[in-house]
Each structure stands twice: as C-alpha cells, then as structure tokens.
C-alpha cells in the first residue's frame, strides 16, 4: 500500500495533525491526529510503498519495543490509516 498524496503532517503544540491540502481532502467533521510513533511512521513511508512488515521494522529500529508489540502496533496503525482513508 501507499500513503495518499495531498496531505501534510504538522506538529502543533506537541500534537501531530494530518492536514489535507485541497478542499476535497478535508473532512471538517474528522480531525486526523497522530501520536509520536504514528507521526514517525508516516514521515518514513510518505509517498512510498509499504506494508505491516515495513512499519514493524521501522518501529524496532526507532523504539525499544519487542517484535510482538511492534507487529501489533504496525497492524493497528495500518487499520487506523485505512479507516480514515489516508492509505490505499
């Protein structure tokens, strides 16, 4: 899968928000926020092909977590991103 184009990740007061750059990408009823790990993952894969294994390896390289936790978090992140329509 790949991140959809037209989004910018912004940090505002320690929070990470994904902003649509065009009117058709903006849903004013739903704000897409990321925690630090999700923001890191987005920055690493933005515009590139990736899968759950890619995210798992990125988490293992950046954070001190077990492989089991990294896999679980990677899969949950992908599911969240699919649900809000920012990957395809």
Which role fits each region the language model picked out?
Residues 31-88:
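Long, charge-rich, low-complexity alpha-helical segments
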Residues 1-43:
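Acidic, low-complexity/disordered tracts enriched in E/D and polar residues
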């Amino acid at each position: 899968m790949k991140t959809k184009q037209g989004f910018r990740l912004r940090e505002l007061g320690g929070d990470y928000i994904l902003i649509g750059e065009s009117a058709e990408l903006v849903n004013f009823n739903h704000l897409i926020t990321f925690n630090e790990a999700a923001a890191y993952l987005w920055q690493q894969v933005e515009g590139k092909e990736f899968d759950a294994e890619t995210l798992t390896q990125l988490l293992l390289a950046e954070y001190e977590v077990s492989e089991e936790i990294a896999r679980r978090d990677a899969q949950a992140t992908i599911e969240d991103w699919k649900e809000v329509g920012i990957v395809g």
